[in-house]
Design a protein with these regions (language model features):
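Acidic, metal-coordinating helix/loop segments flanking the phosphotransfer/catalytic sites
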Residues: 30-48, 69
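Alpha4 helix (beta4-alpha4-beta5 surface) of REC/receiver domains from two-component response regulators
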Residues: 62, 83-98
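Acidic catalytic/metal-coordinating carboxylates
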Residues: 33, 59-62
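The feature encodes the CheY-like receiver
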Residues: 56
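Two-component/phosphorelay signaling modules centered on CheY-like receiver
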Residues: 11-29
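Conserved acidic carboxylate
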Residues: 8
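C-terminal output helix
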Residues: 86, 104-113
Length: 152
């Protein structure tokens, strides 16, 4: 099973992320700071990182940058309560796979996780939402994300 790191300083949000993904059989480790996650990644490997944007010390964006500069190639999904157009542009330039505003919908996050991992979507409701959304998409990734969020 794929291994996911969750980097979130708010315990309730960390729990919601882990709980929302646990039914899909992922191995999940949580960290309260990006520094802790980075130290862990120096010794181990994950398949995906889900990180808050604003963290004490190193930010989720800084962690994504370090991952891109290093030997790490796993996708990064950012969750934030502080997103704006400039932040989203910077996240995209860094190579972040997706970004979610808090509060987020768990079904859409799961869809993004499966897509980022290149895995088939096993749960029927999410699979139907992905099929409906994909059939509507003919434009940019931004339009696709909007359609996926509306479809689910």
């Amino acid at each position: 099973m794929p291994h996911i790191l969750i980097v979130e300083d708010e315990p309730t949000t960390a729990w919601a992320l882990a709980e929302g993904l646990s039914d899909d059989g992922f191995t999940i480790d949580t960290f309260r700071t990006a520094e802790e996650a980075w130290r862990w990644l120096q010794r181990s490997r994950s398949d995906l990182v889900i990180s808050d944007l604003r963290l004490p010390g190193m930010s989720g964006l800084d962690l994504a940058r370090k991952l891109r500069r290093g030997r790490h190639a796993q996708p990064v999904i950012i969750v934030t309560a502080y997103g704006n157009a400039d932040t989203l542009r910077e996240l995209r330039q860094t190579g972040v796979a997706d970004c979610f505003s808090k509060p987020f919908r768990v079904d859409l996050l799961r869809l993004a996780v499966h897509r980022a991992l290149g895995e088939p979507i096993r749960r029927p409701r999410i699979r139907r939402a992905a099929t409906r959304a994909t059939s509507r998409v003919t434009a940019t990734p931004r339009v696709r994300r909007t359609s996926l969020r509306k479809a689910a």
